[in-house]
């Protein structure tokens, strides 16, 4: 027993664990899981963390109840602000321009440089009216040419009788099929009157002529805008509607879409309008082109 109690000095520390244990270092046990004693432990326990989280949650709930029970008075132009809601402002900030104009704000209309509603005060004059009529019977053109006055017929040059009258001053083309074309009248009434006179001449020559399907096929008008026009600038700006070849023809050809009218525009300011079926199309086309011509007026 004395030999067991007497241990060498180097083994005395191992025999007494309490004297060999360093403060702050845990005691290792063979049954302890590997790495348990090596993991540093936090200085604060989990009980203290849960207490702090519970206090923060209680403070947030108290603040939410206070904000919902006492809503703040919203200023003018703003909606009441609730907890975790975004403020919606309808009034613009000072010194900024609102994105959408107010419906009560008066809006200034944009005036075009050459308004289409501007009246020119110029009325185009009708220069020629082309009309057609059907006499309703076959005609012997040689007989008409020999027996009628002021009639000529040359079948090698043109297969129709050319007849003229003085009042109204017009010319008729009479075909063997009974169709007739009347040109040269200055108004719709004159064109109809002239066509009836030609039909009466044919009747007197012994043909059963009638007066069927009278129709105006074309009207030609002209006017003067009283100022020179820059045709080069006009054709560049309106090149999809116009063509200008001064070496071939001195006028600019402008093909209007609505109404379907063709205009011949000259540098002197003279304008010729053709292709109309009624008189109103001539007037409408000129009122449409006049602001454009005014925009290309020569200054010198």
From Swiss-Prot:
InterPro entries: TBP, TBP_CS, TBP_dom_sf, TBP_eukaryotic. PROSITE patterns: TFIID. One of its GO terms (biological process) is transcription by RNA polymerase II. Sequence repeats lie at residues 126-202, 216-293. Residues 1-22, 53-119 are annotated as: Disordered. GO terms for cellular component: nucleus; transcription factor TFIID complex. The keyword Manganese does not apply. The keyword Hydrolase does not apply. Residues 57-99, 107-117 have a biased composition (Low complexity). It is found in: Nucleus. Keywords: DNA-binding, Nucleus, Repeat, Transcription. Belongs to the TBP family. PANTHER family: TATA-BOX BINDING PROTEIN (PTHR10126). Belongs to the TFIID complex together with the TBP-associated factors (TAFs). Binds DNA as monomer. HAMAP family: TATA_bind_prot_arch (MF_00408). This is TATA-box-binding protein. It comes from Protobothrops flavoviridis. The gene is TBP.
């Amino acid at each position: 027993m004395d030999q067991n109690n007497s241990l060498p000095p180097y083994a005395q520390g191992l025999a007494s664990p309490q004297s060999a244990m360093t403060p702050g270092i845990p005691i290792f046990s063979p049954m302890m899981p590997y790495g348990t004693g090596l993991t540093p432990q936090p200085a604060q326990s989990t009980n203290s963390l849960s207490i702090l989280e519970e206090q923060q949650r209680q403070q947030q709930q108290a603040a939410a109840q206070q904000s919902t029970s006492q809503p703040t008075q919203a200023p003018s132009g703003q909606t009441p602000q609730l907890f975790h809601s975004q403020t919606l402002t309808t009034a613009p900030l000072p010194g900024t321009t609102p994105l959408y104009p107010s419906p009560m704000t008066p809006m200034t209309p944009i005036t075009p440089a050459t308004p289409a509603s501007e009246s020119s005060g110029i009325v185009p004059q009708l220069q020629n009216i082309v009309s057609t009529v059907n006499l309703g019977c076959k005609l012997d053109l040689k007989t008409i040419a020999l027996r009628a006055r002021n009639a000529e017929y040359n079948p090698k040059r043109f297969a129709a009788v050319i007849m003229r009258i003085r009042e109204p001053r017009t010319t008729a083309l009479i075909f063997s099929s009974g169709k007739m074309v009347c040109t040269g009248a200055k108004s719709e009434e004159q064109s109809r009157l002239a066509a009836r006179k030609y039909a009466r001449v044919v009747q007197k020559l012994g043909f059963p002529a009638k007066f069927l399907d009278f129709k105006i096929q074309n009207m030609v008008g002209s006017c003067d805008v009283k100022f020179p026009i820059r045709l080069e600038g006009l054709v560049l700006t309106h090149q999809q509607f116009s063509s200008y070849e001064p070496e071939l023809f001195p006028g600019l050809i402008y093909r209007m879409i609505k109404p379907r009218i063709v205009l011949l525009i000259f540098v002197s300011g003279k304008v010729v309008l053709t292709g109309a079926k009624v008189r109103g199309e001539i007037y409408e086309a000129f009122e449409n082109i006049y602001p454009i011509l005014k925009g290309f007026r020569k200054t010198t």
